[in-house]
Amino acid sequence: MKHSKKLFLCVSFLLITIFIGGGGFMNKDESKETEIKKSFNKTLSMYPIKNLEDLYDKEGYRDEEFNKGDKGMWIVHSEMNIQKKGKALESRGMVLYMDRNTRTTHGYFILTKIKDTGKVKTDDSEKKYPVKLENNKIIPTKQIKDEKLKKEIENFKFFSQYGNFKDLKDYKDGEVSYNPNAPNYSAKYQLSNNDYNVKQIRKRYDIPTEQAPKLLLKGTGDLKGSSTGSKNIEFTFVEKKGENIYFTDSVEYTPSG
């Protein structure tokens, strides 16, 4: 009887230990998810940036990599990537380099087509069209004969100009990953087609699927908020072998040198 009682107590203690330990892991995951949200919120709280030239007067998070007197540079990037089943991956996007020292911006509208042979991905083509930003308008700096393409470039809007993450704190049940040695971190959330940002992306791009996307917040560098590293967001609609549809966006603050 004593033996049975001891065994019962040991098993009970073990179960309590596992339960508490498991709760501890859950709390750690929840805590890390909160940290990741806070880290991204430093950038995403700026969205929507209606006038990109406002970034000339906005300073990001600095560290020892910045030289004294360097006001830094904002790098803004948005890109839509579509690979229909069995076809090449086609990307359309733009990147701007906004120098706060000179208050000038240059960048490129970029078209790429990448073919997956099954063994290796090869660049079939990449076309870059130089642009500048003046009075919050994208202006091609070289002649473009294709009027449709020219209009697409002039009317291009970065996700950071229309996206809104005011409800980021309410996103729940994220798949969290954190590697302090790399360092890198991420959080992934399943969205619905009723999500505000999903509606905005669908409004601007012809997305050949009704499937609702997953949102991936992906960062490198110090999770506590160093200016080194990067923060990227990705809306993944389809991710299969030979078929991919995803949208990427980033706003980074770096030394201008």
Swiss-Prot record:
Does the record's keyword annotation contain Cell membrane? yes
Name a single GO cellular component.
Answer: plasma membrane
Main localization of the protein? membrane
The protein's matches in InterPro entries, at most eight in alphabetical order, are given as:
Csa, Csa_sf
Location within or outside the cell: Cell membrane
Residue stretches spanning the membrane: 7-27
Question: What's the short name of a Pfam family annotated to this entry?
Answer: DUF576
Is Transmembrane set as a keyword in this record? yes
UniProt lists the family membership as follows:
Belongs to the staphylococcal tandem lipoprotein family.
In terms of NCBIfam families, this protein maps to: SA_tandem_lipo (TIGR01742)
- Put simply, this protein is called Uncharacterized protein SE_0114
UniProt organism field: Staphylococcus epidermidis (strain ATCC 12228 / FDA PCI 1200)
